[in-house]
Amino acid sequence: MQTAHIGTDIIEISRIRKAIKAHSQRILNKIFTKREQEYCLSLTNPYPSFAARFAAKEAVAKALGTGIGKVVRWKDIEILKSSKHPEVYLPERVYKELGISKVLLSISHSREYATAVAVTLI
């Protein structure tokens, strides 16, 4: 029988927008992978997608039980869009070290907030 761990996060889109405008490329490069940046910046309004990915990374880190830090860094968690649902990419070492078999993710945003729920299967 598999064990599941859940993580969730919510963030104001305006908070991400302000951070990106204040710190621009520095904050983008610290938190988001090149592919995440390319996708979000291809949109007319990239801030909801950046905020959703930020919330997703937080939710995944919580579901992993590690938070963001020594075991998992911001850019270790990559959130990419697929045709059906968001996909989570982690380094193989994270799967092995934490005994994770799969990560499931749901993300959403409204006009003001972005939210994410992640489930890790062990």
From Swiss-Prot:
Coiled-coil stretches: none
Broad EC category: transferase
Function in brief: Transfers the 4'-phosphopantetheine moiety from coenzyme A to a Ser of acyl-carrier-protein.
Keywords tagged on the record: Cytoplasm, Fatty acid biosynthesis, Fatty acid metabolism, Lipid biosynthesis, Lipid metabolism, Magnesium, Metal-binding, Transferase
Keyword Secreted annotated: no
Pfam families named in the record: ACPS
EC number(s) stated in the UniProt entry for this protein: 2.7.8.7
The protein's required cofactors: Mg(2+)
InterPro entries documented for this protein: 4-PPantetheinyl_Trfase_dom, 4-PPantetheinyl_Trfase_dom_sf, ACPS, Ppantetheine-prot_Trfase_dom
Protein name, as recorded: Holo-[acyl-carrier-protein] synthase
Catalytic reaction equation(s): apo-[ACP] + CoA = holo-[ACP] + adenosine 3',5'-bisphosphate + H(+)
Origin: domain of life: Bacteria
Stated family: Belongs to the P-Pant transferase superfamily. AcpS family.
Localization terms from the record: Cytoplasm
Example of a GO cellular component annotation carried by this entry: cytoplasm
Molecular function via GO: holo-[acyl-carrier-protein] synthase activity; magnesium ion binding
GO BP terms, alphabetized: fatty acid biosynthetic process
